[in-house]
């Protein structure tokens, strides 16, 4: 495929990924609860919503893989080794995303036990559900870390190659580095609460304009490939 085609694919993937993510947040709000027993009860009441969320998670995983390939194709002429590393990070993000539906399905099976089996509010079920919730959180943060590493690499290559406006590229680098620093701290339990929400705002301020730019303007040839 041509650079123009890959740029449009990447632009669409950025915006589609964000749109699906927002939809998941809206759907997830109805089944969110701090207590495990309450969470299982909500999942039982809104099982169809949980199933839709599972499908959307699979969609985001495929979108992440599509975005990884498109960004690699755009940036490989600037530095193939770094572009390959960025590709691996984003592919890893997508593959970890496939694990999330399995965890959700495990919780859903506990929330909606078959007739004749133990109820979801038994001590054993609650312990298992609590572990699955923690595992899901760890998996999400780990996938986000791979996303941040890959985003840092691709943003740097876009900046170095002058393929997009420098100001936008710098926002991408800064937003990505911020996540690279804070996400491991969140995984270790050293950062929590409002900070874990605010730290994503700079990334949104980068990816939404970038998606639109790639769709409308595309990317310039790498700086090293431009005539002097």
Q: Can you name each region flagged by the protein language model?
A:
Residues 1-228:
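Hydrophobic, aromatic-enriched alpha-helical segments typical of multi-pass transmembrane helices
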């Amino acid at each position: 495929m041509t650079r123009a085609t890959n740029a449009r694919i990447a632009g669409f993937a950025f915006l589609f990924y964000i749109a699906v993510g927002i939809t998941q947040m809206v759907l997830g709000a109805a089944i969110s609860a701090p207590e495990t027993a309450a969470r299982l009860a909500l999942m039982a009441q809104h099982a169809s919503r949980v199933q839709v969320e599972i499908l959307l998670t699979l969609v985001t995983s495929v979108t992440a893989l599509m975005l990884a390939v498109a960004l690699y194709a755009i940036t490989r002429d600037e530095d193939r080794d770094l572009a390959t590393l960025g590709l691996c990070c984003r592919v890893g993000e997508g593959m970890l995303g496939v694990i999330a539906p399995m965890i959700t399905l495990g919780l859903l099976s506990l929330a909606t036990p078959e007739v004749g089996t133990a109820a979801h509010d038994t001590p054993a079920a609650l312990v298992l559900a609590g572990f699955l919730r923690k595992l899901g959180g760890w998996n999400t943060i780990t996938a986000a870390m791979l996303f941040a590493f890959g985003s840092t690499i691709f943003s740097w290559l876009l900046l170095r190659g002058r393929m997009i406006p420098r100001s936008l590229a710098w926002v991408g680098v800064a937003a990505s580095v911020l996540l690279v620093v804070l996400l491991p701290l969140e995984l270790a339990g050293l950062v929590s609460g409002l900070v874990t929400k605010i730290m994503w705002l700079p990334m949104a301020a980068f990816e939404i304009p970038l998606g639109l730019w790639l769709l409308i303007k595309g990317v310039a040839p790498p700086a090293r490939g431009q005539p002097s």
